[in-house]
A protein has these predicted regions:
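Short, contiguous acidic/charged loop-to-helix segments that flank catalytic cores in large enzymes
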Residues: 1-2, 6, 121-125
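Catalytic-core regions built around general acid/base machinery
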Residues: 47-54, 76-84, 129, 133-134
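EAL-family c-di-GMP phosphodiesterase catalytic domain
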Residues: 35-40, 61-72, 86-190
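Short charge-dense sequence patches
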Residues: 1-2, 26-30, 80-89
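Helix C-cap/helix->beta junction micro-motif
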Residues: 26, 55, 84, 140-141
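A short alpha-helix capping/helix-coil boundary motif
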Residues: 28, 56-58, 77-80, 112-114, ...
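Catalytic core of bacterial c-di-GMP phosphodiesterases, primarily the EAL and HD-GYP domains
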Residues: 5-76, 149
Length: 190
């Protein structure tokens, strides 16, 4: 936990010191991981919110990716981040559908499907049914679904047919360093 906590602190410190201004000037959203150890630390959460408050980046552009199971054990921290305007992305949404027995509307903004679940969805009826179930729960809860990384066009067709809201991966665009994106790319929509 101490290593994860230190890594979270370093990621946020480096982002706010080196990239937040450029990201804000482009008006693009950024998704950064937040570990369970970081989420459980009131000090780290407060530091994150302080850095956000002192940066030009609007909170609505900061998406925090947290493991899905952490939302219940650390609901207070998650709610604090959401009230500050941050978007919450629950990751590792996969075969364990029990989470939907406790997940309520307004607990998160996005559900990030497990990459393994999406990888061969075009040829696996069970994975397709699981994604369809997750998509239905997401709609009921007012959340958007994110799938990826996608490397085959056929997977995009299948995921789009299911109704997945957002898809990422090399078939959409090659991964690029953040510095390259904010300093050399053009964006038309904020």
């Amino acid at each position: 936990p101490a290593l994860s906590h230190a890594l979270d602190r370093r990621v946020f410190h480096d982002f706010f010191q080196q990239a937040a201004k450029a990201v804000a000037s482009k008006g693009i959203s950024i998704a950064l991981p937040l570990s369970v150890a970081g989420l459980s630390s009131a000090t780290l959460v407060n530091e994150l919110l302080e850095q956000l408050e002192n940066s030009p980046l609007p909170a609505r552009l900061l998406h925090l990716i947290i493991p899905a199971e952490a939302i219940f054990d650390h609901a207070e921290s998650v709610q604090k981040l959401r009230l500050a305007g941050c978007r919450i992305v629950l990751s590792q949404m996969g075969r364990d559908l029990q989470i939907f027995n406790s997940l309520k509307a307004n607990m998160a903004d996005y559900l990030l499907l497990d990459g393994e679940l999406c990888a061969n969805v075009q040829g696996n009826l069970m994975d397709e049914m699981l994604i369809t179930i997750i998509q239905g729960h997401a709609q009921r809860l007012g959340m958007k679904t994110i799938a990826g990384p996608v490397v085959l066009p056929l997977v995009i067709d299948t995921l789009s047919g299911i109704g997945v809201d957002l898809i990422y991966g090399d078939v959409i665009a090659n991964a690029q360093p953040l510095d390259l994106l904010v300093n050399r790319s053009y964006f038309a929509i904020n």
